[in-house]
Amino acid sequence: MSSRVLTPDVVGIDALVHDHQTVLAKAEGGVVAVFANNAPAFYAVTPARLAELLALEEKLARPGSDVDLDDQLYQEPQAAPVAVPMGKFAMYPDWQPDADFIRLAALWGVALREPVTTEELASFIAYWQAEGKVFHHVQWQQKLARSLQIGRASNGGLPKRDVNTVSEPDSQIPPGFRG
């Protein structure tokens, strides 16, 4: 087992017990590493060196500047928690997934690259409102994640086309055809 000794002065525990005043007086820097069974056991420190170390620790505990900043600069505003119904509930129009929904979806095995759009959320809510089923909030989020995964994958990851747009003819001639 390796250990780090923080002083060059090393003494056995028997020598320290026999004459601790002489050992500490000869110690460079007022500190001695005490070994027992060929391994470091503890450090013996003179009262003067202990006072120096405590003064240094107190000095380091104080701020390095005399400028005092307002406590409000250190306090981040608390986000107003969204009221999520306890237990199981039916889907309602104002339901929202949690702010860390994408991270949670990844934990459930659904990798979402983009957050849920308002259209996707509205479609999900409308469908499940009509169903009238009840689930816990986490279960609703899991259903939303799976719904997004299936919906986005069904079109090769592309957004759904608007059926009201007028299609434009392709002006390129495929290879092998004459133009």
UniProtKB/Swiss-Prot annotation:
**InterPro entries assigned:** DnaT (IPR020917), DnaT_DNA_bind (IPR040480)
Instruction: Provide the Gene Ontology terms for cellular component.
Output: primosome complex
| GO terms, biological process | DNA replication, synthesis of primer
**Which keywords annotate this record?**
DNA replication, DNA-binding, Primosome
Region spans: Disordered = 156-179
| A Pfam family that the UniProt record links to this protein | DnaT
Q: Which residues belong to the signal peptide in this entry?
A: none
Determine the domain of life of the protein's source: Bacteria
**Description of how the protein assembles with itself and partners:** Homooligomerizes. Interacts with PriB. Component of the replication restart primosome. Primosome assembly occurs via a 'hand-off' mechanism. PriA binds to replication forks, subsequently PriB then DnaT bind; DnaT then displaces ssDNA to generate the helicase loading substrate.
What does the UniProt record say this protein does?
Involved in the restart of stalled replication forks, which reloads the replicative helicase on sites other than the origin of replication. Can function in multiple replication restart pathways. Displaces ssDNA from a PriB-ssDNA complex. Probably forms a spiral filament on ssDNA.
- Family named by the database record: Belongs to the DnaT family.
**What protein am I looking at?**
Replication restart protein DnaT
- Record the organism: Escherichia coli O157:H7
